[in-house]
């Protein structure tokens, strides 16, 4: 017979209260159980000592007999120091998706182009002759205007 240590839900609607029970794995969640070894009240504060109440001696006994705890109960057992929980590692979960990678590459390309433009030597020598040409044109314009004024006066 496969035995598991799991939570059996009790309490009213929207007011959950769980018993930590040892039960046959084939029995319903809230159905028959072999032994109640604790309680879990998720409505209490996380630092409240009554949030998880566990009979560690009975939990150790059932684990030695071969009972398999569910994930949530395994967390409680780990917190109580009864059984160490295996650390899970899923590095692919944190890896960004394909579209996010494409956006990051585009952003990196834009930044690289902006840095190249900023680091490239500015074309100041080419800009200075253009400024000189404008001053020369401006110097010629008053002479032409003066000539135009003289011709209209005559």
Curated annotation (Swiss-Prot):
Q: Per the record, GO CC terms?
A: cytoplasm; small ribosomal subunit
Q: Where is the composition biased (Low complexity)?
A: 110-129
- The annotated region (Disordered) lies at 82-154
Q: Which PROSITE patterns match?
A: RIBOSOMAL_S16 (PS00732)
Which is a Pfam family this sequence falls into?
A: Ribosomal_S16
Q: Where is the composition biased (Acidic residues)?
A: 142-154
Q: Supply one GO BP term.
A: translation
A GO molecular function term, named singly, is: structural constituent of ribosome
Q: Which intervals carry biased composition (Basic and acidic residues)?
A: 92-109
Give the record's keywords alphabetically.
Answer: Ribonucleoprotein, Ribosomal protein
Superkingdom, taxonomy of origin: Bacteria
- Check the record and name the HAMAP family matching this protein: Ribosomal_bS16
Protein family per UniProt: Belongs to the bacterial ribosomal protein bS16 family.
What's the name of the protein?
Small ribosomal subunit protein bS16
Q: Which organism is it from?
A: Rhizorhabdus wittichii (strain DSM 6014 / CCUG 31198 / JCM 15750 / NBRC 105917 / EY 4224 / RW1)
* Gene name of this polypeptide: rpsP
